[in-house]
Amino acid sequence: YNVGDTKEVDLGSFGTHTVRIANMSECTNGETSETACGFVVEFADIITKQEFNSTPTNVGGWRDSELRTYVNGTIYNSLPSDLQNVITTTKVISGHGKTSGETNFETQDKLYLLSGHEVYEDGTRYQISGYDTSYSNTKQLDYYKNQGVTADSYAETIKQDDYWWLRSAGSSTTGSFLMVDSSGGWFNFGARGSASFPFGVSP
């Protein structure tokens, strides 16, 4: 197996989707989140669209979000049983928003969205580390590192020319999570977006 290898997976009512090997390297710089350590698989496409929360808040971050419940319930349960059986529980560290007193969140998840740093390294012009408080707790996944993805250069992050959520709360607001846009760039967006326009889910 190699980083970047893909395979199609039948998710029942969600249809057929593509998973890819996103990482094989171990964490060696004291990363406390296990989300980019060792063998990591991600979806190379968008499974469905969903709001992060039904109200425009990032209080409680990924840990307390409605989307985390959905991903680890509805989406996980749609996976073939042979795939469910090989997915291990992962220690997930996620960034917080501007709410007073909040620190980074720790969860134990079967499935999780990627963080800002797991996709983007800081660029020279733009830095995502200023918006993702968990930046130093994880590292860039091998797939995106091999593609040279930074906050300045990001064409290889595009999934179906659409928007998809990251799990990092936008640190400068109380109502946004980071996202990847249709051109591959990143930005803050209100956690709810709008009722009629949810964004892509790609754990």
Positions of PLM-derived features:
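Collagenous Gly-X-Y triple-helix signature in extracellular proteins
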Residues: 1-202
